[in-house]
Amino acid sequence: MFPAGPPSHSLLRLPLLQLLLLVVQAVGRGLGRASPAGGPLEDVVIERYHIPRACPREVQMGDFVRYHYNGTFEDGKKFDSSYDRNTLVAIVVGVGRLITGMDRGLMGMCVNERRRLIVPPHLGYGSIGLAGLIPPDATLYFDVVLLDVWNKEDTVQVSTLLRPPHCPRMVQDGDFVRYHYNGTLLDGTSFDTSYSKGGTYDTYVGSGWLIKGMDQGLLGMCPGERRKIIIPPFLAYGEKGYGTVIPPQASLVFHVLLIDVHNPKDAVQLETLELPPGCVRRAGAGDFMRYHYNGSLMDGTLFDSSYSRNHTYNTYIGQGYIIPGMDQGLQGACMGERRRITIPPHLAYGENGTGDKIPGSAVLIFNVHVIDFHNPADVVEIRTLSRPSETCNETTKLGDFVRYHYNCSLLDGTQLFTSHDYGAPQEATLGANKVIEGLDTGLQGMCVGERRQLIVPPHLAHGESGARGVPGSAVLLFEVELVSREDGLPTGYLFVWHKDPPANLFEDMDLNKDGEVPPEEFSTFIKAQVSEGKGRLMPGQDPEKTIGDMFQNQDRNQDGKITVDELKLKSDEDEERVHEEL
């Protein structure tokens, strides 16, 4: 694109071409015709030997035209040619600046039309001729091609070739635009194109950076719209033209594709595409968010997508880790929300752009799906879904052995795990670090038969690294139902009595009274204590294995039997250990 040039008011200098065709009007007999008897011509003879298919306008009286011609006599001898001077004729038609025959011969012509004109002497240079060039009473033959036509009353002509169905905004004065264009003269001669430069033409509209006609022609355009803009020379480069590519007094034709538009005063634009019901929390500065996105330019060109990487984009918002426009655009979003975020370049990558996919001064459009977000200060969110109808006197606490069913999913509904796949409830001892901290917390204080929903932030789940099947930094949603609970055992205990242990423990355990207790007697004694309700084993473990571990602990010398000296209660061992430490 060429810059706007200063207006020109210099007088038109007439070359020899115009001097030949100037106001030398013979005394004629008006609009006559060729003599039927083959005598002298009474009027101009016009042969239209090439007529273009499209003719949007025809030359009228008072129009300014630019044309090439060859002038010859009847014998074919050339007396003048604009081609020889490589200079078009540029002149007003019908105001006496041309010989009458040429004035009449140009009327009704279309751009790119070719005509042969036969001008009789009385409509040419008459009985006087033009000294040294045109003899008296000469009939003149002209071969003319019209290249341009305009009128001082013309305005910019705008034709919309393609308009997108959705138009988020239209160009106004003061906006900054990026567009592609092809520039031609009215006869189709190309003089410039942005496509050959490998980038759009970027400029402000209505600020004097463009020729006046282009300033006007871009107004009201939508991103993605295609226009044809015809600009008369007095709204383009006027009498001086531009360099060697745009001649003086040339009408210009631009085919324009608007890529994007913004204003330096623009803020981030938000459009909610889908809002899930029951949004109880919106993202704020300092939250950590996981989201999917498609990023495109204003014309729809995709430059990036998290979906192509099969991984969410994970970041803190409102803390400068992402471009300012995205930082702003993500705040206030709900989990599961889909929104469109339009970011002007001064809140994105500015005048320089980034990489080879985001050009300078580009407006960016992100279609975002918020998967989840959390704050490092978040705790487990607990919501009771249902409670048993009967009175609940005992609830779960640290150390309890619990059985529960659960479904675990991401906040977008993606199911990860369920206990129903295993055909039995999950088992855990609360506070024993056997489940993630958030689930451990959420299972406490429950009644048997109660159902809860737990929202567990990642720092109380699987953290930034995630786990098998669990993405990093994922917030987890659990639905849990408590099936049963049992009081647990103190840490380090495999068996406890409900009351005091027997006073003569070894004698009671030595069933055959031989002074030693083999594994069979030990197992029989412990099982009897459990069945009689005098004691209980660690819940959730295989009783045989637990009893075997207890026997191994008491068989100090590992000889396969327990003696009275070896048998000690854990409480006695703990007291001895404390005494030794003291």
Swiss-Prot record:
Motif Prevents secretion from ER mapped to chain: 579-582
EC number: 5.2.1.8
Domain EF-hand: 497-532, 542-577
Xref: InterPro entries: EF-hand-dom_pair (IPR011992), EF_Hand_1_Ca_BS (IPR018247), EF_hand_dom (IPR002048), FKBP-like_isomerase (IPR051989), PPIase_dom_sf (IPR046357), PPIase_FKBP_dom (IPR001179)
Residues bound to Ca(2+) 1: 510, 512, 514, 516, 521
Keywords for this protein: Calcium, Disease variant, Endoplasmic reticulum, Glycoprotein, Isomerase, Metal-binding, Osteogenesis imperfecta, Phosphoprotein, Repeat, Rotamase, Signal
Glycosylation-annotated residues: 70, 182, 294, 310, 352, 393, 407
SUPFAM superfamilies noted in UniProt: EF-hand, FKBP-like
GO process terms (BP): aorta morphogenesis; collagen fibril organization; extracellular matrix assembly; in utero embryonic development; protein folding; wound healing
Annotated catalysed reactions: [protein]-peptidylproline (omega=180) = [protein]-peptidylproline (omega=0)
Residues in the signal sequence: 1-26
Linked pathology: Osteogenesis imperfecta 11: A form of osteogenesis imperfecta, a disorder of bone formation characterized by low bone mass, bone fragility and susceptibility to fractures after minimal trauma. Disease severity ranges from very mild forms without fractures to intrauterine fractures and perinatal lethality. Extraskeletal manifestations, which affect a variable number of patients, are dentinogenesis imperfecta, hearing loss, and blue sclerae. OI11 is an autosomal recessive form.
Task performed by this protein: PPIases accelerate the folding of proteins during protein synthesis.
PANTHER family linked to this entry: PEPTIDYL-PROLYL CIS-TRANS ISOMERASE FKBP10, PEPTIDYLPROLYL ISOMERASE
Protein name, as recorded: Peptidyl-prolyl cis-trans isomerase FKBP10
Organism listed in the record: Homo sapiens (Human)
Organism placement in taxonomy: Eukaryota, Metazoa, Chordata, Craniata, Vertebrata
Gene from which this protein is expressed: FKBP10
